[in-house]
Amino acid sequence: MALLHSSRILSGMAAAFHPGLAAAASARASSWWTHVEMGPPDPILGVTEAFKRDTNSKKMNLGVGAYRDDNGKPYVLPSVRKAEAQIAAKNLDKEYLPIGGLAEFCKASAELALGENNEVLKSGRFVTVQTISGTGALRVGASFLQRFFKFSRDVFLPKPSWGNHTPIFRDAGMQLQGYRYYDPKTCGFDFSGALEDISKIPEQSVLLLHACAHNPTGVDPRPEQWKEIASVVKKKNLFAFFDMAYQGFASGDGDKDAWAVRHFIEQGINVCLCQSYAKNMGLYGERVGAFTVVCKDAEEAKRVESQLKILIRPLYSNPPLNGARIAATILTSPDLRKQWLQEVKGMADRIISMRTQLVSNLKKEGSSHNWQHITDQIGMFCFTGLKPEQVERLTKEFSVYMTKDGRISVAGVTSGNVGYLAHAIHQVTK
C-alpha cells in the first residue's frame, strides 16, 4: 500500500512539473459522445423489469411474447430436443454457412410457407435466404426495397402494427405510412376502413400485411376478406410484403395460417415473405428465419438472389448455423415433422383454451361486458380493450403486468392463474 501511495505522489509531482502530462490526461477525460442522450426504455422490457421487482406471489407477466407451458415455464419442444440429439450424434463441424444460409433449410422453409406442390417452387421462380430470425428477414427485405424498389419509398403498415416494423423500415431508408386495421369500438378488424384506405394507396407502393395472428391485436381477416384485399392489391399494382412470424402457431394448422400468402400468389401477385421459427419451434435464442422473394421467372430469381447476398455480406456476413440445422432436421424428417406439427397444434390449442377459460371466468365474476373479442382473436396476443388507467390499476393493485395499450400475451395465462386474471380484470372494469 505504501508503495502504491508513493507512486501516486510521484505521478502527481510529474504532472505538476510537466504540464504536457496534465494536458494529455485532460484530453483523455474528454469524450466524443457528450451529446448522446439517454434513449427511451423498451416498453416491453420495462414491463419485465417491473415484474421482476414485484414481490407479490400472484404476479403475472403478460407482456413478453414468448410461449409458456401450463406451469408458466419456458417450453422446449420435444421434437427440437430430438433434432438436437440427432445433430450431436453426427459430430458435425462448425464451419461458416454460405451467405444465403443453409440450403436445405431455405428449401424446406419455402415449401412450408408456399406448399410443397406450389407452382412457384416447381418453376424455380423464387429465392429464399436464411436470416437472423424474423427481424433479420424484415431488415434484409427493407434494405432490398430501399436499393431496388424504384417506384416508391412508402411502406404502408396496418394501424397498429408490430412496434419494430417502424424502426426496421425507417432505418433502412423507407418512409412509413399507415392504413386502418383495428377497430377499437368492436375490438375487431376494421375491414371497410382497411379496404377503403388500401384502395387509396398510390399505385406501386409497398403494402405490409401480417399473414396470420396479427401482432399486437390478434385480429385477422377472414378468407373472403383476404380475397377482396388481394383483388384491390392486384388492381392497384401494390407490392405485397408479408410478415409471417406465426405459421402454425395461430390456428394450429400451418396450411391454414399460410392461406393468405398462397392465395395472393395464386392470383398472380408476386409477393415477398418473412418467416420466423422463434414461436412455432420455440427457437427464440437461435435466431432462425427466412426471407423469400417470388419473382417473374427463374432467371430473375437468380439476379435477385445475387443482390440479396451482396446486401447480407456487410450486414452480418452469414447467418447462424445451429438453429438452421435444428429447423432443417425437423422439416426434412417425416417423423420429426409429424411430431412437430402435433406439438405446434398443442401450443395453439392451449392458447385457444386459455382464451375460452378467461371469458368463462369473467362471466363467473359477474362481468356485464362483452368479452367475445377475446375468443374471436387469434394467436399469442390479445387486445383486451382495456384503457391505460385500467392497465395501471391492474399493475398497482393486482401485480398483473402488460403493455399500456392493453395487449396481453395469452401464452402467459395458465389454468392456475386464469381465475385470478379474470377477477383482476373484472375489478378494474366493473
Curated annotation (Swiss-Prot):
Modified residue annotations for 3'-nitrotyrosine: 96
Entry binding sites for substrate: 65, 162, 215, 407
GO biological process: 2-oxoglutarate metabolic process; aspartate biosynthetic process; aspartate catabolic process; aspartate metabolic process; fatty acid transport; glutamate catabolic process; glutamate catabolic process to aspartate; glutamate metabolic process
Extent of the transit peptide: 1-29
EC class (word): transferase
Sites bearing Phosphothreonine, chain numbering: 48
InterPro entries registered for this protein in UniProt: Aminotransferase_I/II_large, Asp_trans, NHTrfase_class1_PyrdxlP-BS, PyrdxlP-dep_Trfase, PyrdxlP-dep_Trfase_major, PyrdxlP-dep_Trfase_small
Location, primary (coarse class): mitochondrion
UniProt modified residues of type N6-acetyllysine: 59, 73, 82, 90, 107, 122, 159, 185, 234, 279, 296, 302, 309, 338, 345, 363-364, 387, 396, 404
Residues bearing PTM Asymmetric dimethylarginine: 313
Keywords annotated in UniProt: Acetylation, Aminotransferase, Cell membrane, Lipid transport, Membrane, Methylation, Mitochondrion, Nitration, Phosphoprotein, Pyridoxal phosphate, Transferase, Transit peptide, Transport
GO MF term set: kynurenine-oxoglutarate transaminase activity; L-aspartate:2-oxoglutarate aminotransferase activity; pyridoxal phosphate binding
Family annotation (Gene3D superfamilies): Aspartate Aminotransferase, domain 1, Type I PLP-dependent aspartate aminotransferase-like (Major domain)
E.C. code: 2.6.1.1, 2.6.1.7
Protein family (similarity comment): Belongs to the class-I pyridoxal-phosphate-dependent aminotransferase family.
Primary role: Catalyzes the irreversible transamination of the L-tryptophan metabolite L-kynurenine to form kynurenic acid (KA). As a member of the malate-aspartate shuttle, it has a key role in the intracellular NAD(H) redox balance. Is important for metabolite exchange between mitochondria and cytosol, and for amino acid metabolism. Facilitates cellular uptake of long-chain free fatty acids.
Protein name: Aspartate aminotransferase, mitochondrial
Organism: Mus musculus (Mouse)
